[in-house]
């Protein structure tokens, strides 16, 4: 399974890096030709919304998880995990961040190596909080901007689809935006306006993907701390040092 995952990740990275710029350029050219430069204004609202949601989850949700589920002070975690988040931001790849994440969780957060060795690789492909958040907001942005009616039921379905899709998202740069298309197709958001909105997301989503990766790898580290605490395999002296 691990070898297959690596092959898929390498293949997606190659395809995205090689062909995505040309595809995005063609889509944007058509977008600006039809709607003009004003079509970028709604996209800015999408960017701001995603950034606020990601930072809120990072600085509010994770500390709450650590305090309530692991019964530890979240300040040492946030301080020590900062370099993991920064590395994830710069590489935009959970797979590339895995060695540093494992080293940090074991040596600085006091997580037993057995826990880190199991939780972190699993979380790299399953625990995709940031990806799910981005895909939900992006799908709603596409729906609203392309004239589809968004109801509470449709939002719930989008959230479920995003959760399922994020679990299988490969740990490769830009993969989240590619998987987003499956959600849009599943919801039936496939008219011309929806495709144009999706092209805007592809064009501006690189910094968003970097923040998403930071959130994902931080979530993996937080989960390993919680699991280690539950299994009584967390060295709290190292954690609080």
Positions of the model-derived regions?
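Buried hydrophobic positions in well-ordered alpha/beta secondary-structure cores of metabolic enzymes
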Residues: 8-9, 94, 119, 171, ...
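Membrane-interfacial loop-to-helix junctions in multi-pass transporters
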Residues: 12-17, 53, 70-77, 109-116, ...
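Transmembrane alpha-helical segments of multi-pass membrane transport proteins and ion-pumping complexes
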Residues: 18-22, 54-63, 67, 92-96, ...
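Signature of multi-pass transmembrane helix bundles
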Residues: 1-76, 237-241
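Small-residue-enriched core segments of transmembrane alpha-helices in multipass membrane transport
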Residues: 44-61, 80-85, 156-169, 179-184
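Hydrophobic alpha-helical segments of integral membrane proteins
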Residues: 1-15, 40-47, 77-81, 85, ...
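Transmembrane alpha-helical segments and their short flanking loops
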Residues: 136-241
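Helix-loop-helix junctions within the multi-pass membrane cores of secondary transporters/permeases
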Residues: 86-166, 236-238
């Amino acid at each position: 399974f691990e070898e297959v995952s690596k092959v898929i990740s390498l293949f997606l990275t190659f395809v995205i890096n090689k062909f995505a710029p040309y595809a995005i350029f063609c889509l944007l050219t058509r977008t600006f030709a039809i709607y003009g430069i004003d079509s970028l204004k709604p996209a800015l609202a999408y960017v701001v919304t995603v950034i606020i949601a990601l930072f809120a989850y990072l600085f509010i949700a994770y500390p709450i998880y650590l305090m309530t589920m692991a019964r530890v002070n979240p300040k040492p975690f946030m301080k020590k995990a900062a370099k993991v988040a920064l590395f994830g931001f710069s590489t935009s790849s959970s797979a590339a961040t895995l060695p540093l994440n494992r080293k940090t969780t074991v040596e600085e957060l006091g997580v037993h190596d057995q826990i880190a060795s199991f939780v972190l690789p699993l979380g790299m492909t399953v625990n995709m909080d940031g990806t799910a958040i981005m895909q939900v907001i992006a799908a709603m942005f596409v729906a609203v901007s392309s004239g589809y009616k968004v109801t509470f039921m449709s939002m719930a379905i989008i959230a479920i689809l995003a959760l399922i899709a994020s679990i299988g998202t490969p740990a490769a740069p830009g993969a989240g935006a590619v998987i987003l298309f499956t959600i849009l197709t599943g919801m039936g958001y496939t008219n011309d306006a929806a495709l144009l909105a999706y092209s805007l997301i592809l064009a501006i989503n690189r910094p968003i993907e970097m923040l998403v990766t930071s959130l994902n790898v931080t979530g993996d580290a937080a989960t390993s701390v919680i699991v280690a605490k539950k299994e009584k395999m967390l060295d709290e002296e190292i954690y609080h040092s």
